Amino acid sequence: MNIYIHTLGCFKNEVDSSGISTVLKRAGFNMTSLDEADMVILNTCGFIRPAKEEAINSILRFIDYKKSRGVKLIVTGCLAQRYLSDLADEFPEVDAFVGIGKINCFPDIVNRVIRGERVIEGGDLKDLLNFEIEASPLVYYLKISDGCNNRCNYCAIPLIRGPLQVRRPEDILEEARIAINGGTKEIVLVAQDLTGYNYKGYSTVDLLKDLNNLDGDFWIRLLYLHPARIDETMIEAVSNLPKVLKYADIPIQHIDDGVLKSMG
């Protein structure tokens, strides 16, 4: 069975798609291009209106592709998590809708679809971080946590992905070490909010220091920092750790107190 994975949305979805690819390859499936695929897995975003519209349009496009090429079609990701029942009713042509946190279940789900079963399966928020990635590209997106506790008025992430969950530091460091040994030159730390990471008192800054001390010729990039928790300790770490890029991804609305207040 040849499988093509098409990913929409943010870098965190890219990480999830890599996890799906890894578990399927270990189960004996082949990851291929769209032209060679017998099955398409569409990993969607469901965060804001344009992302939802893109996801719906992609579902429609792959339904047309399914009709012309006879492939199986699985839709997963945030849109499937958020609107599971509605999507299942609206798009009967789709062979499976799968919520988030089900990465390790994909071999079973794929086999059920192959047997002709239509699978409608909600996500498991307790299992968002329990998966492995084999590939070590030059730029490696390393997820350190999932979910969020901020609950801003405008944001659907806690609704979709639940409260903050963090990975054990030793697991993060081991994954980084494997990636670096495999040729990765840029480790990109991703989370809903990197500054919210805390594992039994071990903070984002502690993690940066330990990552910086790993052997190898690489650098570290930070994405998705909430400015409320960017303190002097964080600034000092970013400034002084040689492998950490002097860069932070912070939404522009955070420069305006009035906008922040209205956002919650």
Language-model region placement:
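Proteins enriched for Cys/Gly/acidic motifs involved in redox and nucleic-acid/cofactor modification
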Residues: M1-T195, T233, A248
